[in-house]
Regions:
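Short beta-strand-to-turn element immediately C-terminal to the catalytic PLP-Schiff-base lysine
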Residues: 41-42, 60-61, 153-155
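General structural feature for long, well-ordered alpha-helical segments within catalytic domains
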Residues: 2-10, 67, 90, 94, ...
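Glycine-rich phosphate-binding segment of PLP-dependent enzymes
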Residues: 15, 48, 54-86, 93-113
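A secondary-structure boundary/capping signal
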Residues: 36, 51-53, 140
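PLP-dependent aspartate aminotransferase-fold enzymes
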Residues: 96-170
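Active-site-adjacent loop/helix segments that line or gate small-molecule/cofactor pockets in enzymes
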Residues: 1-36, 86
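Active-site and channel-lining beta-strand-loop segments
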Residues: 29-49
Length: 170
């Protein structure tokens, strides 16, 4: 696909506003096709330093060799990916290891798919911990915590654009 075709598809099927913003920036005129370490590479041959770290998911960089090696070995052995509907020895072992690092009363793990889900779970833990007696949640208003109702309610930058109801007292 050309950059124009990609932009058209983004506009039609993903987010017209995001398309407008990205298209106005220099990187919005490029197609990125590969990445390694802290650099992303475009089809036109440019090497761009990625300051975002994948918005928090690429702390070790793009395609880190140790992670790639582990992934390749995992796939070569035809291991079952982490699956929440059946027993997973990986989740069992990881949760056991995590429990040794935390205080004794924090001995359960709850595996989630995203940061927004983690924030939502944190809100629920607060609610349960105080038996619904607390009426407010302390949060940073210059923040982004996710796009779900709860996480969006405590995201300062997202609240003004959100077209959904907010949690009370946020």
């Amino acid at each position: 696909l050309t950059i124009s075709e990609v932009q058209d598809l983004y506009k039609k099927y993903i987010n017209p506003n995001q398309t407008k913003i990205f298209s106005s920036l220099p990187f919005g005129k490029e197609i990125f096709d590969s990445a390694e370490g802290v650099f992303m590479h475009t089809l036109s041959g440019k090497k761009i330093l990625d300051f975002t770290g994948g918005l928090g998911v690429l702390g070790l960089g793009h395609n880190h060799p140790d992670i790639l090696k582990a992934r390749i070995n995992f796939q070569r052995e035809k291991n079952l990916e982490v699956h929440k509907i059946v027993f997973s020895r990986y989740m069992a072992a990881l949760s056991s290891s995590i429990s040794f690092l935390l205080p004794a009363n924090l001995n359960k793990s709850f595996f989630l798919n995203s940061g927004a889900e983690a924030v939502e779970a944190g809100i629920k833990v607060c609610y349960k911990s105080f038996n619904s007696k607390k009426k407010f949640i302390l949060y940073s208003d210059k923040s982004y915590h996710g796009k779900l109702i709860g996480s969006g309610s405590i995201s300062g930058s997202y609240k003004k654009d959100q077209q959904f109801p907010q949690m009370e007292n946020c």
